Amino acid sequence: MKKIWLALAGLVLAFSASAAQYEDGKQYTTLEKPVAGAPQVLEFFSFFCPHCYQFEEVLHISDNVKKKLPEGVKMTKYHVNFMGGDLGKDLTQAWAVAMALGVEDKVTVPLFEGVQKTQTIRSASDIRDVFINAGIKGEEYDAAWNSFVVKSLVAQQEKAAADVQLRGVPAMFVNGKYQLNPQGMDTSNMDVFVQQYADTVKYLSEEK
């Protein structure tokens, strides 16, 4: 009996120590108004955002978060249209096309690089070329671009940003209740930061 009690006490202490690593107002903040029906893990970004580029291509935040997520928990990425003017809106629609066709992984890097690195993306036609170079047929892209599904996905992205009162990117939300706060994490070492970021998402995804 004593051994069982000690084992249970050990589990409680381990849980307490784990929970103590994460503090509301430090690594994350709780939304004043939770969003019902929000994706389990939702990241907002813009191809015009330098920090988003760093998160994706240098730190690989998305990949590390996905690796840590509990089984059955899905991560969703939405593009915002409040950066880049009309081209930013075109990129939001193009991202909706990517989601509809399931080719997000194929176009993320070339879109980021075309906007920020080579600056070869300056029009909707340039965006279309990225998809074609990634192996998507032009007619397939055009059909998706003009489809009801894509229009719905554009509206969905815009509504999601409004629901959480999004003020900037990159930003990640969990269960429609919590927003990650990178400023409250250890940035002295990038590997440690990435690990802490991913671990915090995992912790919050398991919170009810």
Curated annotation (Swiss-Prot):
> Where would I find the Thioredoxin domain in this sequence?
20-150
Tell me which stretches of the chain form a coiled coil.
Answer: none
Q: Which residues form the signal peptide?
A: 1-19
Q: Which CDD domains match?
A: DsbA_DsbA
Q: Where are the transmembrane segments?
A: none
Q: Which UniProt keywords apply?
A: Disulfide bond, Periplasm, Redox-active center, Signal
What's a GO cellular component annotated to this UniProt protein?
Answer: periplasmic space
Which domain of life, per UniProt?
Answer: Bacteria
Q: Which GO terms describe its molecular function?
A: disulfide oxidoreductase activity
Q: Which cysteines are joined by disulfide bonds?
A: 49-52
Subcellular location(s) per record: Periplasm
Q: Respond yes or no to whether keyword Chloroplast is given for this record.
A: no
Q: What does this protein do?
A: Required for disulfide bond formation in some periplasmic proteins such as PhoA or OmpA. Acts by transferring its disulfide bond to other proteins and is reduced in the process. DsbA is reoxidized by DsbB. It is required for pilus biogenesis.
Similarity section: Belongs to the thioredoxin family. DsbA subfamily.
Quote the protein name from its UniProt record: Thiol:disulfide interchange protein DsbA
